[in-house]
Amino acid sequence: MPICIQNELPVKNKLLEEGVVVIEENRAKNQDIRPLKILILNLMPKKEETERQLLRLLGNSPLQITVEFLHMTSHIAKNTAQSYLEKFYKTFDEVKDKYYDGLIITGAPVEQLEFEDVNYWGELNSIFEWSKTHVFSTLNICWAAQASLYYHFGVKKEQVADKIFGVFEHDVLIENHTLTRGFTDTFLAPHSRHTRIEEEKLPTISELDVLAKSEEVGTLIAATKDFRKIFVTGHIEYDANTLHNEYVRDKNSNLPIEVPVNYYPGNDDTKVPKNRWRGVAYLFYHNWLNQVYQQTPYDLTELGK
């Protein structure tokens, strides 16, 4: 089934070129279908790149999905024109009276700051709290996973000596869980972060299941038992060249950065990296949307009751 996005969203043509099925909002409004409503809070600097990565995965579902984008008003974007945000993004004030089947909160390049020092922390707290009564399932990615675990459960983050950067092997810990159904017993996924969560605290949280974990870099996927909060500490949505672009950026800026682990063929950064996690990404998002579809109420206003 197609994914419904704004008619003039620039990434639409790129998605069509990739074979992603897209339906324009004008046509979708004339169909007698209750699509899943997904809101994406995009905190990444390169908005269009992240839009494309997530829409590609959402568009692989057999379900019809309507997507809206959200940005923070308490933060001035440095890499995206305000006119672009005003045209294609909503503010929290514009969506706070609405209800959504799912909310995706992306990572953000602020992980080396204390949570309370992030300039939009107060606004994000309001969104976390609002999501309890207005969103069925919230998927938190990378820094957002750390922030959400901290807000909801008091799990702190810790600085690591060397950046967790590369493609790591993970083990599925709970067989046949709805989010990891169809995964191989071990699988690869990218990470790119300077911090880790308090791993030792996760087993003490009775509402939480750890679903996939790496011996090298810790938890990748966790979820509350009621499916309302999902946490992914890595970046399974990344393109094949995203880690490469981050590596080149930091190298050119003379920042301390090592070659991404297990990423380039032969560990040679002159060779083209391969995407070895694409299947996992598609399957994970398919599983998430499928469970949202099955469990969310038809009348979303029931979430607040």
What is each PLM-predicted segment?
Residues 85, 89-92, 108, 115:
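Helical hinge/lid and interdomain linker segments adjacent to catalytic or ligand-binding clefts
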Residues 50-53, 79-82, 115-116:
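Short, glycine/acidic-enriched capping/hinge loops at junctions between secondary-structure elements
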